[in-house]
Each structure stands twice: as C-alpha cells, then as structure tokens.
Amino acid sequence: MSVPIVPTDFAHAPKLEQLKNEFVECYDTDDSRKFFITRSPGRVNLIGEHIDYCQFSVLPMAIENDLMLACRLTSESENPSITLTNHDSNFAQRKFDLPLDGSLIEIDPSVSDWSNYFKCGLLVAQQFLQEKYNFKGPVHGMEIYVKGDIPSGGGLSSSAAFICAVSLAIIYSNVPAGTPILKDELTKTTAVAEHHVGVNNGGMDQAASICGIEGHALYVEFKPELKATPFKFPEDLPISFLIANTLVVSNKAETGPVNYNLRVVEVTVAANVLAQKFGVTLQTEGNLGKGTLRNFMDSYYTKYDKSCRKPWDGEIQTGIERLNKMLQLVEETLDPNGYTLDHAVELCGCESISQFTELYLTNFPVRFQRLKLFQRAKHVYSEALRVLKALQLFQKGESNFFEEFGALMNESQESCDKLYECSCPETDSICEIALKNGSFGSRLTGAGWGGCTVHLCSTDTVDSVKSALTEQYYNLRFPELTAEELEDAIIISKPSLGSVLYE
C-alpha cells in the first residue's frame, strides 16, 4: 500500500486552510511554486510493553493528534537550503544549506536542537532516494512551516511523527510526479532515523504513525522483518481511548541503572540462562548482542520439536502454544527469589565475573543486588501472549469485546507493575480512578516509571473518566496546571489514519 496523496481544495478543508494561511503569513503568497502538506500522527501502544527489544510483536494504534508540515519548493538552484519555522515559538526558526554534491546531511548529535530531528528525516530520505532511484543530485530546497498538537515529551511519539512527515516530504518532492510512496518502504526508511541522534528505537513508532488506519489497531512485527498488519475494532462498538499523562518524568540518566538499563540486562541474562539449561545457541541479536527471549523460544523449538523445526513465523495459534510452553519452562527453571552475581555467572556458563561483566554489564550502567530473571522473563512471555490473545478478539469480533480486551489491558498493567516493576504510584492511582469511573481497561503505555497511561472507554463513559481524573488526580496533585496544560495531559482519540500527503 502507498501513502495516500490527496488532491485537495484547501478552501474546503478548514484545518488545512488554516495551516496554509499561517504558512503564507510566515513566508509570502508566491503561488508559482509547488505547495503541499504532509501529515503524520502520534501513536499509543495498547498492549505489548517492554517486549519489542525482545523481538516480540506489539499492538499500537495511530491517534488523531498529528504533526503537519506545510512545504513549498524554493526556486534557488545554485544554493538549495531548508528554512524551518515552527508554530510553537519555543522552537526558533532554523535555516541550513543542503550539500551541493548530493552528499548526506551531517548531524551533530551532541547538539540538542529541534532541527536535528528534521535532519534525521532528511538523511534517511536521502539514503532511500540514492538506494532506490540512484538519486545523485542535491535535494530540492524548501520553506517549511511545522504545526502539531501531539504533546512533546508525553510518550506519544511526537518526534517519530515529525520525522515521518519530513521523510515523506523529502521523498515526494524529489521523485517523478505520480510516483507511489509505499508505506512499508517509508516505515523501514524512518525506523532507524532517530539512531542518528542517539535514540535506539525499534520501528514501532514509525510503523504506527505511517500505517495507521481509522478504526484499526496495528500488529507490528519485528521478525523476520518490520511489518504492520491492521486489525479492525468491532464496527458496532463506540470505542474511544483516553490517554492520560501522569506528569511524572523519569530521568533516564539517573534511574536507568536500576530501571530501563537493568531490565535490558535481566531479559538478556534470562535468555542465556535458559539457553544454557536447555543446550541451545542464541543468535547475536538484541540490545546487548547476546540474544533475546524470542531467540531462545525459536532455538528451543528448532531443537526439541521434531514436527516443526522452524522459528515462529508469527502465526497466532502457534505463537500461543509456544508462549505457553515458554511460561512453563520459566516456572520450572528460573528462581523467583532472584540471582546473585556469582550465581548468574555460573548459570550463564561464564568463567569469571569479569567475563560476565564484559558480556552483559558494559553496554549500559546498571546497579543491582539480585537479578530478577524469573519475573522479567515471565512478563515478556505473558505480555507477548496477551498481544496474540488480543488479536484473537479482533478476529472473533465478540460482543463482549470491551470486557475481554479491557481485561487483557488490566492484566498487562498488573504484569508491568508486579513482574517488570515499571509502574509507579501515580500510574497506579490514575488507573484505579479510571477503572472506577467507566474505563474497561487501564494500563501504562511507553517505558513506564511515569509517563502516559491508556484507557479503553466507550463514547458514553469517556467523559466521566476524564472528569474523574481531572478532579481526583490533576486538581489534587497539580493544582497549578493551566487549562491548556490540562488539555495536553488528557487526550481522547479513536484509532486514526496514518501518514497522508495533501497537494
């Protein structure tokens, strides 16, 4: 499927007309040069937390809040440049020249500036143009006006939406007219863009932003390749999702050694302890290059299942059977009391603490007394299982979808809290308030330790959930919030359309 390119009478599209008017106010009214708008939405992950870096699939959706770029090609031919203006005055205007020889734009990740994210989208688009079309010249210069309503820093992937809209604009303006821009190619192109500013993401955000479909969630797979498959919510159900920000920010530099970084180490060590126990070899994949819990599952079945010595191909029923087996092995093999460093060294087959440290503890700073391998592995396998059970609900289209999907979300929150320990008191409080006031399922979304929560509601109950959260959480904990800040903290959205280009 290709990104929709929609011929548009801007005078009959109020939101787009407003954006064009603001562009004209910023620049000028020269209509002789090509003008177009690219749009990409934010996303929220409905289920499947902290399992993407274990190579298991996740279930996000695109939200209605989006980011748009109003773009106009410049007439300059000798010195092409990009001029960036942001509707938000907190982001100063930027202008930079484009390499005349067609070489890739340079990015300095040590400099924290919003234009670096534009350059990320530009750079990967340049690479795509060179690889697919043998594009050699400099890309077209443009004047660009940026506007969006995705709260930044709220865990809804505003940066990914920005990059997707940028890459779409660069590719569209540098290929022959009428050339389709395929969604899967744009997804794979942008999936690695943020790596250029030091963000080690895996592609879920970009897949959801680009491939979103109204009324659908997206089953995003990472193996054998990045792929997004839409699953439709039951048509006759008035579904709404409420996304509430705890307004708690976890400083990753300070808390990483005992939170996120440590979880990456624990799931990797768990995979290797299981591999040693069952005599299988893991591929050099994952964040530490030492294999993942998905690798262990595939290696286990390759060795022990005589009927099918193949890695899992994503088929739902097979995945459910295999994940249930993995949960059984975790219960039988790993100790709920945790592992000291010495014990982990022995079970991983390392010869010394120094060897274990070199293999597992040097990529990221970590601190621990005991490694909770049982809890982390149980969360990963059970969360991956919940994703597949959610897909079964989509396929059945059952009348009690609210209750059953909500139950999976609640189980996910329980697992994130008790097994992965990535919740926090504020998240727990928001979920409790929401469930008492009309939410069918409430859970954290994103990395956790603060950040956002997501709640499954009906259109009949979503307003009561919002009112309860306003009165019982925000007004009590953050009485200084302005009306605008409160509006950013609570977002109501239905599953939305992904990237679009208007010309």
From Swiss-Prot:
EC code: 2.7.1.6
Active site: D205 (proton acceptor)
GO molecular function: ATP binding; galactokinase activity
Substrates-to-products reaction catalysed: alpha-D-galactose + ATP = alpha-D-galactose 1-phosphate + ADP + H(+)
Domain of life of the native organism: Eukaryota
InterPro entries on file: Galactokinase (IPR000705), Galactokinase_CS (IPR019741), GalKase_N (IPR019539), GHMP_kinase_C_dom (IPR013750), GHMP_kinase_C_sf (IPR036554), GHMP_kinase_N_dom (IPR006204), GHMP_knse_ATP-bd_CS (IPR006203), Mevalonate/galactokinase (IPR006206)
Induction per the UniProt record: The GAL1 gene is a member of the family of galactose inducible, glucose-repressible genes (which include GAL2, GAL3, GAL7, GAL10, GAL80, and MELI).
GO cellular component term, pick one: cytosol
Claim: Iron is one of the keywords in the record: no
Any one Pfam family match given in the protein's UniProt record, by short name: GHMP_kinases_N
Pathway(s) of this molecule: Carbohydrate metabolism; galactose metabolism
Function (record text): Galactokinase is a key enzyme in the galactose metabolism where it catalyzes the conversion of alpha-D-galactose to galactose 1-phosphate. Can also induce the transcription of the GAL genes in response to the organism being challenged with galactose as the sole source of carbon.
Name of the protein: Galactokinase
Organism (species): Kluyveromyces lactis (strain ATCC 8585 / CBS 2359 / DSM 70799 / NBRC 1267 / NRRL Y-1140 / WM37) (Yeast)
